């Protein structure tokens, strides 16, 4: 799939407001909505799920009412949503928003979706439900670090960049190796060597990246936000999801940061303090991955998300008021 097409003669750049968790993306996006008839396209693999509001830090009703939002609450937690689906949806939405005379604004931190939209998708094997179930069962018996060790034997390059408990990525890398007989790292390297993205030359994005000047300060903000989620009913939200009876920790929805840790707590596998510590640590790890992806995006315009006037700087860079 190619990058989203764009006619630079008739349309300004698609502004993308990217940043790690807890970097203030929502506040900045709503400030931009005050400058222009903005419609926000969510770039967040967790916000797509219905019934998952607190642990995903979903925008409030008031925030959602301040500007049209898209790709939030679009699928059931029992279902999955892929980068390919995001590209299809985002391409359609960009065209529709522009046809209405409005301004598309892409906001979020799921960098895989951003890369797929702007650079195209790779041709790796499709997901195999039976194989994933087999790997989930193996992980339940032996633990994800054991599967990480298995991955290191067949694809050391990929294993070296994954944490031993990064279940979703370990599973995907093992799945690709089992289905193709080749390491995922080798497949991606070959595709990168020969890839030319149709539309990449004439597609213009203005990428504004919210990055912290002090990572420890962002870590403190992450801990405060996680504690606020717990105080606002996060555990009760996960309890409601468990009562449905059709959800389990192997699903992408329940693997979302925070949800897996609370699920384990409700299973009796951790006490409250351990659950809290693991949830905050997992969020920090997510933040680190997001920043790593962002810093590999040379076209980005960096804004210090901890600076008092960061919203005003975002507004100047987006240039919606002109």
From Swiss-Prot:
Its cofactor is Mg(2+). Keywords: ATP-binding, Magnesium, Nucleotide-binding, Transferase, tRNA processing. It is an enzyme of class 2 (transferase). It holds the Pfam family IPPT. GO terms for molecular function: ATP binding; tRNA dimethylallyltransferase activity. The keyword Coiled coil does not apply. It catalyses: adenosine(37) in tRNA + dimethylallyl diphosphate = N(6)-dimethylallyladenosine(37) in tRNA + diphosphate. Monomer. Belongs to the IPP transferase family. This is tRNA dimethylallyltransferase. It comes from Cupriavidus necator (strain ATCC 17699 / DSM 428 / KCTC 22496 / NCIMB 10442 / H16 / Stanier 337) (Ralstonia eutropha).
């Amino acid at each position: 799939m190619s990058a989203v097409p764009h006619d630079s003669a008739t349309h300004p750049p698609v502004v993308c407001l990217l940043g790690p968790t807890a970097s203030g993306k929502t506040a900045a996006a709503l400030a931009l909505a005050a400058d222009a008839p903005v419609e926000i396209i969510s770039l967040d693999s967790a916000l797509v799920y219905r019934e998952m509001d607190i642990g995903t830090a979903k925008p409030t009703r008031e925030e959602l009412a301040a500007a049209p939002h898209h790709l939030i609450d679009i699928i059931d937690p029992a279902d999955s949503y892929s980068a390919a689906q995001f590209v299809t949806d985002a391409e359609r939405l960009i065209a529709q928003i522009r046809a209405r005379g409005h301004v598309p604004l892409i906001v979020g931190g799921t960098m895989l979706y951003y890369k797929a939209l702007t650079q195209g998708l790779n041709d790796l094997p499709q997901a195999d439900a039976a194989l994933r179930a087999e790997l989930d069962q193996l992980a339940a018996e032996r633990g994800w670090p054991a599967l990480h060790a298995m991955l290191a034997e067949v694809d050391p390059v990929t294993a070296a960049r994954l944490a031993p408990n990064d279940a979703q990525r370990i599973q995907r890398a093992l799945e690709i190796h089992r289905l193709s007989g080749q390491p995922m790292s080798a497949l991606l390297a070959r595709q990168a060597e020969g890839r030319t993205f149709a539309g990449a030359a004439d597609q213009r994005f203005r990428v504004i990246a919210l990055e912290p000047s002090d990572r420890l300060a962002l870590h403190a903000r992450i801990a405060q936000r996680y504690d606020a989620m717990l105080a606002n009913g996060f555990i009760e939200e996960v309890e409601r999801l468990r009562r449905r009876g059709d959800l389990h920790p192997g699903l992408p929805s329940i693997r979302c940061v925070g949800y897996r840790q609370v699920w384990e707590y409700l299973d009796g596998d951790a006490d409250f303090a351990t659950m809290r510590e693991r949830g905050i640590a997992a969020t920090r790890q997510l933040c680190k991955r997001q920043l790593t992806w962002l810093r590999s995006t040379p076209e980005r315009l960096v804004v210090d998300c901890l600076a008092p006037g960061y919203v005003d700087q975002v507004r100047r860079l987006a240039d919606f008021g002109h």
